[in-house]
Amino acid sequence: MTTPDIALPRRHVLDSTMAYREAGLVGAPIALFLHGNPTSSYIWRNIIPPVARVAHCVAPDLIGFGQSGKPPIEYRFQDHARYLDAFIDSIGMTSAYVVAQDWGTALAFDLAARRPGFVRGLAFMEFIRPMADWSEFHQVPAARDTFQKFRTPGVGEQMILEGNVFVERVLPGSIKRRLTDEEMAAYRAPFPTPESRVPIWRLPNELPIAGEPADVWTRLEAAHRALAASEYPKVLFVGNPGALVSPELG
């Protein structure tokens, strides 16, 4: 199993590269791990080892995150889907059991809708979905206020690009225990400059709330309809307290 301080293998993907962690049994069913914002495949470091006893685990760093490249793109949801597709194709993956959290869930739902038969099973938590209004976004009112600021022109850029608030405050604030210095260093490493934090800033602006952004809303509505109609096995992990997902959903 690769440790966070060792350079991960990379694949040439479109006009850039994507890094990934890989462990487990060659020839076994694939477990594809998809992280969210502002993390990387590092978030799965304690989950992959036990799963690797029965599966071939692959955990990419999404484009712009972790040790993956940062090409000059907008880092919209559609960009992440495009690069993830290319990564999957580059390693010849034809099906997988998917484990996803945060924006990784949106990518998983979208992937399953566009590639029938690819997803053999889905384990997910804190999932992204079309939300009618801000009251559906988060269980904590202060968090809703913060994310509304992230979407306010000029304010969000100052908070995330200049202040690195997402890494320094939102991430550690969403975890019950205190992150170690080593863990925080791993999460900070991909984002040393304001320019490098554009991928972090973009994703709060992609959240499908009250019909906006329209293209993301439409795409994820279709993905959720496909999810509801699908027959592959699924398991939803619900925390107490939850963040994006309330304990009542469990």
Model-derived regions, located:
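Flexible "cap/lid" subdomain of the alpha/beta-hydrolase fold that forms the substrate-access gate
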Residues: 2-24, 30, 58, 65-99, ...
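Conserved HGGG/HGGXW glycine-rich cap/lid loop of the alpha/beta-hydrolase fold
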Residues: 22-67
